[in-house]
């Protein structure tokens, strides 16, 4: 899935130049729909965060720029919800840049991934406020990946209320 490990071009798949690539995308969405439907039938809601960190370009879904990415995000949304009838998803968007925002109707929660450096426990207020600016509507904002956990006192002081945070792995989890 890393850009430097594949020759797949999302732009070509989405604009019709790579019909096999487009079909591969549909097949992948259809395969995951089976699993999501099983969770739906079991009454399990899913925080669904597909195609994360797109604006970074290090994953294939972000390597072709915002337009093909947004097309893919919307394709996935409609394929899962309209075609397959999946209705247990809470859509968590994590494109990290307003140019990549697919639109309010496709997003329930806006997520930010932040790795500020070793032993940086700030509230990340600037990134929180940036995430708020992606839309004119009210959206929940989450810290969907992080290194150090923000200091609760700094969160309170700055009035920054991330809905949740998800400390990714490694030293941030294992060391005190």
Where are these regions (language model features)?
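Substrate-binding cleft of extracellular glycoside hydrolase catalytic domains
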Residues: 1-75, 82, 86
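Acidic (Asp/Glu)-rich catalytic clusters
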Residues: 2-6, 36-43, 101-105, 133, ...
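Alpha-helical scaffolding within the catalytic cores
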Residues: 31-35, 93-101, 122-131, 147-155
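Aromatic-lined carbohydrate-recognition surfaces of secreted/lumenal glycan-active proteins
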Residues: 49-51, 73-99, 138-149
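Aromatic- and acid-rich polysaccharide-binding/catalytic face
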Residues: 97-120, 166-169
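Substrate-binding surface in catalytic domains of secreted glycosidases
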Residues: 112-133, 138-139
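Substrate-binding cleft of secreted/luminal carbohydrate-active enzymes
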Residues: 139-176
């Amino acid at each position: 899935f890393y850009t430097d490990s594949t020759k797949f071009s999302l732009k070509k798949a989405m604009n019709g130049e790579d019909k096999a690539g487009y079909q591969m995308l549909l097949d992948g969405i259809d395969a995951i729909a089976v699993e999501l439907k099983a969770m739906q039938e079991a009454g399990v809601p899913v925080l669904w965060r597909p195609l994360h960190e797109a604006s970074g370009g290090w994953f294939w879904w972000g390597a072709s720029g915002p337009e093909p990415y947004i097309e893919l995000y919307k394709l996935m949304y409609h394929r899962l919800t309209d075609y397959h009838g999946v209705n247990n998803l809470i859509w968590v968007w994590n494109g990290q840049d307003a140019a990549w925002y697919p639109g309010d109707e496709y997003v329930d929660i806006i997520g930010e991934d932040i790795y500020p450096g070793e032993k940086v426990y700030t509230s990340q207020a600037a990134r929180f406020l940036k995430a708020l600016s992606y839309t004119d509507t009210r959206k929940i904002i989450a810290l969907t990946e992080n290194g150090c956990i923000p200091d609760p006192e700094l969160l309170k002081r700055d009035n920054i209320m991330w809905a949740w945070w998800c400390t990714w792995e490694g030293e941030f989890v294992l060391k005190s």
